[in-house]
């Protein structure tokens, strides 16, 4: 797995920063610092080609330790070897931090360009959740970029993503009610949100093992393998609960949703738990996490084969949005490569970036 699967609106406040090391001339020049609570680093190769890559990392669960100074993303070395300068932010918050990340990356872009002085072209490259950051940036701040790349990206509007996560949780609760080790109120409940990720995963995995035929049916509907299903469900629960905390309540509901593809759909729709959205939270995902498809700079999208996190139904969303927005001329979807979530090697990352610069 290549990058981390983890994935402030005022004037930039730049804290003093120091070089990480007095490097020999043959090694990249590295500096680091903090901008309004977001740690950052900037790496510049000795043979810099004059181009800057703003690298947006993926989802990082709340509470994961953050080393200081900020370590480089796994793909940094390959980009530096290809001649690009790489700027990356740790973001001011953890979790589904798309809204924070857009602002953190913009502050860092301003600083990086002022430090580098002579930047010929600027790109934004995002992995996983960072893919949504990259695309939202190209939609909202196109004047600062020549184009961008979303790799293994969660390229969905926030409301659509949250609805997808909710579907996963209520489907599990329907097929596995009162599972041992899990709250009787279900995976959407506050009690489920209070569980540790390990306890949540273990309870889900045990329930799925108790009814393998039903688990296989659910895996097919959710477009993941049976082996990946426990991790996918627990991940969806973690992200939805964190998003609800960030947004001020459950951001989506299913009071009128008609579900399909769960076997006896009539029984499923009659028996599935129903939830109402919180208006404030709904406004948050519709505003802060919106994606419209109206990309205004060249955008390259690429996924991996058999990705249990960004499954085919999710992969199709942004191209459809771009088509409705009349922006398909700026969008290039490359064939899937690698396996799993964010299974890219350095050369594939560089080639995707070069594709963004190629004539459409």
Label every PLM stretch briefly.
Residues 121-176:
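Primarily recognizes the serine-hydrolase "nucleophile elbow" in alpha/beta-hydrolase
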Residues 47-48, 108-128, 144:
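Gly/Ser-rich "nucleophile elbow"/oxyanion-hole loop immediately N-terminal to the catalytic nucleophile
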Residues 23-48:
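N-terminal cap/lid segment of alpha/beta-hydrolase-fold proteins
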Residues 50-59:
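Short beta-strand element of the alpha/beta-hydrolase
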Residues 301-303:
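Short beta-strand/loop motif that positions the catalytic acidic residue
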Residues 331-344:
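Histidine-bearing beta->alpha loop at or near hydrolase active sites
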Residues 309-314:
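Conserved alpha/beta-hydrolase "acid-adjacent" motif
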Residues 154-290:
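Accessory cap/linker subdomain of secreted extracellular hydrolases
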């Amino acid at each position: 797995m290549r990058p981390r699967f983890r994935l402030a609106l005022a004037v930039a406040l730049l804290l003093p920063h120091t070089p990480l090391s007095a490097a020999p001339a043959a090694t990249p020049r590295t500096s680091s610092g903090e901008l309004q609570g977001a740690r950052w680093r900037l790496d510049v190769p000795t043979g810099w080609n004059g181009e800057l890559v703003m690298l947006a990392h993926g989802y990082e669960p709340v509470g994961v330790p953050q080393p200081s100074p900020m370590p480089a993303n796994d793909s940094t070395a390959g980009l530096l070897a290809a001649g690009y300068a790489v700027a990356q932010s740790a973001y001011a918050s953890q979790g589904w931090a798309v809204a924070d990340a857009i602002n953190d990356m913009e502050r860092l872009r301003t600083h990086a360009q002022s430090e580098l002085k002579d930047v010929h072209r600027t790109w934004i490259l995002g992995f996983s959740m960072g893919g949504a950051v990259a695309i939202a940036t190209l939609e909202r701040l196109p004047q600062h970029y020549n184009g961008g790349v979303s790799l293994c990206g969660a390229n969905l509007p926030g409301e659509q993503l949250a609805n997808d996560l909710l579907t996963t949780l209520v489907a599990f609760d329907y097929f596995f009610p009162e599972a041992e080790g899990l709250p009787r109120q279900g995976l959407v409940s506050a009690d489920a949100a209070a569980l540790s990720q390990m306890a949540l995963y273990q309870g889900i995995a045990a329930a799925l093992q108790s009814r393998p035929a039903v688990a296989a049916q659910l895996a097919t509907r959710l477009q993941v393998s049976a082996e990946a299903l426990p991790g996918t469900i627990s991940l969806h629960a973690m992200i939805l609960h964190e998003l609800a905390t960030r947004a001020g309540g459950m951001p989506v509901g299913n009071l009128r949703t008609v579900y399909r593809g769960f076997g006896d759909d009539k029984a499923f729709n009659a028996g599935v738990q129903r939830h109402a959205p919180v208006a404030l939270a709904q406004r948050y995902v519709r505003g802060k996490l919106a994606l419209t498809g109206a990309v205004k700079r060249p955008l390259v999208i690429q996924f991996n084969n058999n990705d249990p996190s960004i499954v085919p139904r999710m992969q199709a969303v942004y191209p459809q949005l771009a088509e409705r927005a009349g922006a398909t001329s700026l969008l290039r979807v490359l064939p899937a490569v690698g396996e799993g979530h964010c299974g890219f090697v350095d050369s594939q990352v560089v080639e995707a970036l070069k594709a963004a610069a190629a004539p459409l």
